[in-house]
Amino acid sequence: MKHLIPVLLAALFLPALASADETVLRVSAIPDESPTQLQRKFAPLGAYLEKQLGMPVKFVSVTDYPATVEGLAAKKLDLVWYGGFTFVQAHRRTGNAVPIVQREEDATFHSKFIVPANSPAKTLQDLKGKSIAFGSPSSTSGHLMPRYYLMKNGIDPEKDFRQVAFSGAHDATAKWVESGKVDAGALNESVFQKLLDEKKIDASKIRVLWTTPSFYDYNWTVRGDLDPKVVEKLKAAFLALDYSKPEHKEILDLQRTKKFIPTKVENYASIEEAAKSAGLLKD
C-alpha cells in the first residue's frame, strides 16, 4: 500500500456513476467497519442531510480505502468520511480535497494495542517475535500511527515481529486477538470501546497493552470543486447537530460523538509527517 500506487487502481471498485453529478450528493466512507454497520451509521445522517440540503443523498459503498480516494479524485464522490491518513492521501491525490468538520474527539484521538487477557506481554518490547494484526494498510488508527509509534519505540514491524497481518477493519482486528489468531492487534480506540459496550467482544478475554499519544484523525471531506453553497450548507448542517435534541441524538450516537467541530487541512500535517517517517508516503 506504499506510495499511493494502489489508489490509482481503486476506480475499478467504484460503481459506474456519472462524474460531477450535482443533483445528488454522493457520500462514502472508508470501510473501517463492516458494510452493515456503515450503512446503519449513515441512514439517519443521510436523511438529515437530505432535509438540510434539499437534495437527494446517496451512500456509495466501496471495497477498500483507496477506492474512496480515487472516487473523490474522479468526481464520483462528493463527501467522504476519512481517517486522517486517508485524508492526507486524498489531499495529495486531488490537490484540493477539503476537510470541513470532525468529531470533537478526533482532535485528540488514540490507537490501542490489545492482547489476549492471558498474554504475558507487559510492554511493546515484549511483542517482539510475536504476531500482530493491523486493520487496513491505509488506516490511520489501525496501521499508520501504531506503526509510527512502534518505530519510535525501536521496533521494526517487518524485522521484529514473527508475522504482520492486515485484518481489513478494526472490529476484525479485535476478533482476531480475542480468538488467539494473533498475539496482538492495533486498532481505533472508539471502535474498541463500542465493541466492549455492545458486548461484541468478551472483555474477559482481551486487554489493552499500550495506548498511543493523541493525534488528529477522522473528518468529513468534500471534493475541492463541489459547489461552495453546498459545502457551506453541509458544514452548517453538521455543526447544527445538537445532542440535547432527541432527533439529533440518534445521529450523533451512531457517529460516536456528541458534537462536530470545524477542521482544516493544517491539522493533518503531523499525520503526513508520520506517514513519511513510517515509509508509507514519499516526499
Regions found by a protein language model. Give the residues of each.
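Bacterial N-terminal signal peptides
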Residues: 6-16
